[in-house]
Amino acid sequence: MKKVTLILVLFLGFIPMLNAQWTSPGNGTTYTMSELVNVTDGVVTFDATNYHIHADLTISQNDVLKIDNGFQKIFVENALVTILGSMICENANRVSVMGDPSFSMRFENATNCDLKKLYFSDGAGIKLIESDVHFDDVKFVYFTTEYCHSAIDIFNCNPVIENCYFLLNEGAAIGSPANGQSSPKILNCEFDSNVNGANIPQINLGPGSEDTIFVVGNLIDGTYAQFHTGGISIADLMGTGDTKILLKDNIIKNNRYGYNQQGYHLNSTIVGNQFIDNYHEDNPMNGGSGISIYGMDDNNRAVIRDNVITGNLWGITAINGFDINLGTEEDWGNNQIHDNGNSGVVYDLYDNSTCDIMAVGNDWGTTDEQEIEDHIYHQYDDPGLGLVTFIPFVGYDAIEETNTALFEVSPNPAHGRFTVEGQGKMTITNALGQIVLTKDIDGQEYIALPRGLYVVRLGDATQKVIVD
């Protein structure tokens, strides 16, 4: 009886060893899944159809994990797969990596990692630590936040994430922390209703590195989120770096808000995007902007061109300190900003600071100057706020100037008053064609008019003048 008991104890003690973690030797070996079955002492197995990873697996520095086309699925049983070397997945067919019930991955100081045509589902998160991993045509579905805050957590690296799809993940799809510097390239991806039950955007980035953060050609849609999620946020709240951002050709719709840029030393170019129907916020004081620029000082910069901003609770909100360029006389903004608002009031642009904003050459959905003025909240509503210069705007440039050498208007633009120098009958009309002044002049005449665009006619000559 004692002999039987001893044998049973020895046998039971041996079972955990079959699934103990395995680490590659770091001698430059390239491993396929089938080769791992032969060398990992039961950590990796094959059941004639699919591969299974039963315990933690580490690919050491100098070694390579290569995923080939010889199978379709890998089931990972609550294990951590760590890549310290390289991982290559250049598949013609899609390979699924599925949690059974969950898994996590960690790339740390990894090099030459190229992942294509993978389908990750039911994971607990993928961490990239100083590892410039390339993801191309990869799907990330049903990730939890058990291992990290996002489906992909980035720390001090510049990965390329292109042609990828993120669906119904519990946390953000892609995130980086406030205490690191990372500049991912996020290109032509689709983000569909990520984040469940938290005030977090689908793309949630901290400070950038020396490289530019690229967010280009993506669809960020929050339509089916159980609790409405934000679109994109890029923030440097501690003044860590000097972040450069290109936000271009994205469609950002049906989120709690569209794009948030917040903190110190952020410099963005925002061009060719669509910020549409980002109104899923019960309290407008807590969000709902198509674009929100919240600066700690005027080193929070944004050049905003050729965007469509409509259907949001607020079109553009500008808060505290910033340097925002929405269009100048020399370089018109050409943004379409209209039909944004809440509580029965239209708010296409809200300047909640002492900073002035140039917003020349935009389409506000109307050519009625007073209507545009009513849709912009700034110094004319509260003398303590900055001034928004929005004239001329799209629709104002239909008036042609003629024979401008016959008389002189100066300064132009003018601040409250200007002079007309010439001889003859002078007629001044506003942008609606209404006559505001008629007078015979001989020499220099001083004119004071309210803010707006005016047409000065003297005989057969015509000139436009802007009063701001």
Which positions does each model-derived feature cover?
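Short, Lys/Arg-enriched, disordered terminal segments
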Residues: M1-V4, I376-Y377, D468
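Bacterial Sec-dependent N-terminal signal peptides
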Residues: M1-S24, E400-T402, G459
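Terminal non-domain segments
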Residues: K2-I7, L167-E170, K253-N255, H265, ...
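Generic detector of N-terminal low-structure segments
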Residues: G13-P16, N109, V409, V420
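Extracellular beta-rich repeat passengers
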Residues: Q21-Y396
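Low-complexity, Pro/Thr/Ser/Gly/Ala-rich linker/spacer regions in secreted
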Residues: P392-L406
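C-terminal outer-membrane/trafficking sorting elements
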Residues: N403-S410, A414-D468
